Amino acid sequence: MTSYRKITSNIAGKLSLLETYLFYCLALCSDCYTMESYIKQDNLTNIYGIKKTDQIREWLHKFESLGLISIDKSDIYGQYGKFNRCSYQLDTEHYVLITNKLYDEPISKELKGFLILLKCKCLNGTNTTLYSQNRLAEELGLAKGLSLIHI
């Protein structure tokens, strides 16, 4: 298992901080080479740290509508009847590498989401960005003048 996950830089400006963190959690639950995941929404809810499966489902469909993931539903027949199984294929075109260690950092989900979005706007393979704070806020879809103190 690799210690990094590919996150498409196309999320910048399209997702909120919390949605970005969910996208990262989904990437953590995906195969590190194919970026395909078979995680159940209940399990993803537990990993994300909320109790609202409906919120997770809503965000997953938003990701799909933005072309960030594709969702494939298939019917599974088992001992207890029929149920749906979803698989998620994450887009990795124009990606950045995000360490798996970020998940365990003792910081808020919002700050983790911000750091992921910030990395999406860095120069290839670096932690350097040439944007001003206001321009960066525009690019990421955040309020101008947003600082880490507010997160």
Task: Indicate where each model-derived feature is located.
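Short recognition helix of helix-turn-helix/winged-helix DNA-binding domains
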Residues: 1-43, 47, 58-70, 74-134, ...
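Conserved small/polar residues in nucleotide/adenosyl-binding loops
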Residues: 149-151
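Short coil turns linking two alpha-helices in DNA-binding domains
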Residues: 51-52, 143-146
